[in-house]
């Protein structure tokens, strides 16, 4: 679809009011018809809408911004997998487009967060080390899920620092695929407290018995909030192991915590341990 033709379809769409909200000129039937017509243009329509995006907060940006979301959503509500994949490939191809504002590049990631699948992962992985985009990129990969997404995060983790490193390990912890175990065991010794805590959550979530040593050691040396969070991860791992029938492994974690949590401030941990031990007796 030619850009001029696309503009004619987009121009009648609702414009935001003085508060930046779409509250007037809302005719759902007409909007749905327009969106379906734009969607018929396939990948070219999506690329055209992206080209039309303007500066964040401007009227010029609002209509193509709205249309782009509606068109991507159209593929989902009509259950058109071929169209969904085609649209998401178009979105992914523009994530690295530096002629777009950071805001709009992040917006493309947000669309991929809920509409994207494996086809979006390589493009999302390429900008994980960009501090301005890392939030949107990592969140999208975590939402897509699976090893294809996790592998992109693990690759980026090797070079990530600061905010990017925290976002990436958080996303890996949410995905909790077994292939990330080695990264979690290394990251739990990281110099950044937030990275260590996220790594402990990842180790708890992958539910592997051999993660217990790393978690217990980290919890023993931690203080304050970090000690609380990593101890909680130890308890979560024990619960997962018990649920999987690995009672001996769960018991070892509980017994270790029982011996080391003697301070009055950690009596609630001892109580949780007693409940856990009773459940696997």
Label every PLM stretch briefly:
Residues 1-33:
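N-terminal "cap/leader" segments of large eukaryotic alpha-helical scaffolds
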Residues 5-9, 48-53, 90-95, 123-125, ...:
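Buried hydrophobic core positions in alpha-solenoid tandem helical repeats
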Residues 19-20, 55-59, 94-98:
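Helix-loop junctions that connect tandem helical modules in alpha-solenoid scaffolds
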Residues 24-41, 61-82, 102-117, 123-126, ...:
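Structural detector for internal amphipathic alpha-helices that build alpha-solenoid repeat scaffolds
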Residues 44-61:
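Short, charge-rich amphipathic alpha-helical segments embedded
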